[in-house]
Amino acid sequence: MLRRLVVTTMACLAAGCGSSDPAPSPPSPSVAGSTVTITSSGVSPKNLLVSPGTQVTFVNSDSRNHEMASDPHPEHTDCSAINTVDLVVPGQSKQTSNLNIVRTCGYHDHQNPEIASLRGTITIQ
């Protein structure tokens, strides 16, 4: 009988042992920057999906200058955060301001607004 009591007590203690701290929760997703690459073929990716608060980096891998601006041309009033990129010379990278408002922003190369391959969208979601 005593042995049964000891075994039962030990089992209860073992079940109750362990950390009283709750299991760690996975880290919240961080807002990581995203990249648009500009080449002689155009921008890639054409359509980019980012989280609110993200800054997008435009990398000019082309041999000529590009002036990235928000739609519509020539007013550039759609997403002012994109207009901070402005002129990007070959080999240079520039970031937008934080894209905070949930929406879709169109952009283009101001120097070549008619070239479809140099147009894209950033969706903040």
What are these language model-derived features?
Residues 61-64, 72-75, 113-114:
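Acidic glycine-/aspartate-rich tracts in secreted/extracellular proteins
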Residues 19-23, 86-125:
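Extracellular/periplasmic metallocenter environments
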Residues 13-16:
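C-terminal motif of bacterial Sec signal peptides marking the signal peptidase cleavage site
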Residues 1-6:
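Bacterial N-terminal signal peptides that target proteins for export
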